[in-house]
Amino acid sequence: MGLPFKVTPAVLVPRPDTEILVQAVMDRLKAASSGGDESLRAADIGTGSGAIALSLLHYLPTLQMVSVDISAAALAVARENAAALELTERIAFCEGNLLAPLAGHMFQAIVSNPPYIPVDDIAGLAPEVRDYEPRTALAGGPQGMDFYEQLVAGAAVFLAPGGFLALEAGIRQAGAIGALAAKDPAWGRQEIIKDYAGIDRVVVLWKK
């Protein structure tokens, strides 16, 4: 992402794979604006250090962001990073669970890198991840799908026509996310984007 981010034990360390998610959202928001000067609005769910939201703001000067996290400690880190990058005027931070703080607002994009590690796999993670990064930012339920299910079920109502939901996916989860969306009449076209290792890493769902 090319920007410096402070991290603490309250947030995940930004991963190289997340650059794929940021680039995917940037490309699609740029296309949506058609090179014009109109303001764009996006929301980042589970913002953590703010790396995704702040990277988008840095590279998209007409973008306004809402960043949500259930952790007050994580939001404190994200606010520090926003101040250090001089981006505070274009971002609002909301403490709350997933999509709930978005009530009454509409966006061109919703982006999330949610917890997606199956609970039984946590013990097998590298010690520097398992022992030092917040479990709440890692564990995604029995199959790692709990947060994807909630986001796919609820995000469309907060998207403007032609808007999209972009999700970072764990290994072998992109297809399952697509299958969830295929059953939901709110979603139309799907895209799957591979990471640097050729793994399906980002799922983009377009609102009908």
Positions of predicted regions on the chain:
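Class I S-adenosylmethionine-dependent transferase superfamily signal
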Residues: V25, L56, V129, L151-A155
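Conserved beta-strand segments of alpha/beta enzyme cores
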Residues: P4, Q64, R90-A92, G188-E191
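Conserved SAM/SAH cofactor-binding pocket of Class I
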Residues: V13, E19-G124
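Conserved adenine-nucleotide phosphate-binding loops and their immediately adjacent elements
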Residues: M1-V7
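Mobile active-site "lid"/loop adjacent to the S-adenosyl-L-methionine
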Residues: Y116-F147
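Conserved Class I SAM-dependent methyltransferase catalytic core
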Residues: P142-W206
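C-terminal beta-strand of the catalytic ATP-binding
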Residues: Y116, W206-K208
